Amino acid sequence: MNNFIFYSPTEFVFGRDTEAQTGVLVQKYGARKIMIVYGGGSVIRSGLLARVEKSLQEVGIPYCMLGGVQPNPIDTKVYEGIDLCRKENVDMMLAVGGGSVIDTAKAIAAGVPYNGDFWDFYIGKAIVTKALKVAVVLTIPAAGSEGSGNTVITKVDGLQKLSLIHI
């Protein structure tokens, strides 16, 4: 693969070992503290998560972590992330994974600055007017979540799976 950059309006950075640039890239967007969101063990076993952490450490950006995002992400993980972001004063999300991880990070990003229940956005009770920035180290480019403002979350109580469009 040839390395290249595509911007539309999301900045996409393509190429081998580009995860090593993560720290420099998020620093460019003003990150002061990041929450890394990831799913299961593949990002750990492959060494990807360690390379991303090293990149952040090299530029001095502190971070906290939220793992265990599952396919068809659930609201309880979003609530957990919102609480942790507020406690840790996070100002940028970094999703390391595929669509479910990205959707979770986006939902958390919308929920952190909101004083109500983030689910209000999904049921049309509120509109997202402010959100944390979201960066992505993509592992599975299947859902398209990395290039859209949409996010799909399942509410465990009642098993509602709803989409929020244009965060």
What kind of feature is each model-predicted range?
Residues 1-29:
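N-terminal amphipathic/basic leader segments beginning at the initiator methionine
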Residues 11, 62-64, 133:
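Conserved beta-strand segments of alpha/beta enzyme cores
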Residues 33-34, 63:
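Hydrophobic anchor at the start of a short beta-strand
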Residues 35-36, 92-94, 135:
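Conserved beta-strand elements of the Class I
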Residues 38-40, 68, 137-139:
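Cofactor-binding loop segments of dinucleotide-utilizing enzymes, especially the Rossmann-like FAD-
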Residues 44-116, 125:
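N-terminal small/polar loop signature for handling phosphorylated ligands or for N-terminal nucleophile
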Residues 113-165:
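A glycine/threonine-rich phosphate-anchoring loop and its flanking beta-alpha core
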